[in-house]
């Protein structure tokens, strides 16, 4: 799973073309990764195996990592305090734990430097491991990215990048001539 996570995040970062300072949101059901139904068998060991490659890749790219909590915490996100302050994200008071927040968010809370929890963000790209519904935290307009890495363990992987809206209708011009 570590190699699959490394491959998936690498493919997405390349396809999305994120610049330093942009944000990648990740949602992950470790239950789904081990072949169980979401929310039933979270694994801190699996969370660690997935989080480390995510951190390595995002830190190397200068991209902020946001880890989505589960439904019990309203899909709040674990981020570094510096990112929360830079983007003026509203902080909330909670400590994610495996049974309320999810194993990956709980691990991220302990592992990210100066971690805090925020209620919502608008990320530039997203990686959804196990169909955790990260779309609420993506900028508009989300564009699907089909990865070669279609699964991590047993969990399906869905990815997206974002682009600015195209506005103006039939007479609009979208590229500088």
UniProtKB/Swiss-Prot annotation:
Pfam families noted in UniProt: DUF436
InterPro entries: Antibiotic_NAT-like, DUF436
Family: Belongs to the UPF0340 family.
Protein name: UPF0340 protein STH78
Higher taxonomy: Bacteria, Bacillati, Bacillota, Clostridia, Eubacteriales
């Amino acid at each position: 799973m570590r190699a699959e996570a490394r491959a998936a995040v690498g493919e997405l970062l390349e396809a999305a073309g994120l610049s330093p300072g942009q944000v990648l949101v990740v949602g992950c059901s470790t239950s789904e990764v081990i072949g169980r139904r979401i929310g039933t068998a979270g694994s801190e060991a699996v969370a660690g195996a997935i989080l480390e490659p995510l951190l390595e890749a995002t830190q190397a790219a200068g991209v902020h990592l946001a880890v989505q909590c589960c439904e019990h915490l309203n899909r709040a996100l674990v981020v570094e305090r510096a990112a929360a302050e830079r983007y003026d994200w509203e902080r909330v008071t909670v400590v994610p734990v495996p049974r309320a927040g999810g194993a990956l968010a709980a691990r991220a809370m302990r592992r990210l430097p100066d971690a805090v929890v925020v209620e919502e963000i608008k990320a530039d790209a997203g990686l959804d491991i196990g169909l955790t519904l990260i779309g609420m935290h993506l900028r508009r307009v989300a564009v699907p990215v089909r990865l070669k890495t279609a699964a991590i363990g047993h969990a399906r992987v869905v990815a997206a990048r974002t682009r600015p809206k195209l506005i103006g209708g039939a007479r609009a011009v979208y590229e500088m001539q």
